[in-house]
Amino acid sequence: RDCTSQSHKFVGLCLSDRNCASVCLTEYFTGGKCDHRRCVCTKGC
């Protein structure tokens, strides 16, 4: 299953899942997506 955590590095409104995911990768997550304009990172747990 996946665990989620709000991104610490993402700045501004989250409008693009791709941008969010690439920021999440720099935070050692495996991906990410926008959720209510916030960038939420995901990784297996």
UniProtKB/Swiss-Prot annotation:
**Is Electron transport found in the keyword set?**
no
* Key words of the record: Antimicrobial, Disulfide bond, Fungicide, Plant defense
Task: Tell me which domain of life the UniProt entry assigns to the organism this sequence originates from.
Answer: Eukaryota
Which Pfam families does its entry note?
A: Gamma-thionin (PF00304)
Q: Where is the signal peptide?
A: none
Give each disulfide bond as a residue pair.
Answer: 3-45, 14-34, 20-39, 24-41
Q: Which GO biological-process labels does this protein carry?
A: defense response to fungus; killing of cells of another organism
Q: What SMART domains does the database record attribute to this sequence?
A: Knot1 (SM00505)
Keyword Disulfide bond annotated: yes
Database matches in SUPFAM superfamilies: Scorpion toxin-like
Q: What is the similarity comment for this entry?
A: Belongs to the DEFL family.
The function of this protein is: Plant defense peptide.
Q: What is this protein called?
A: Defensin Tk-AMP-D4
Q: Which organism is it from?
A: Triticum kiharae
Q: The organism's lineage?
A: Eukaryota, Viridiplantae, Streptophyta, Embryophyta, Tracheophyta
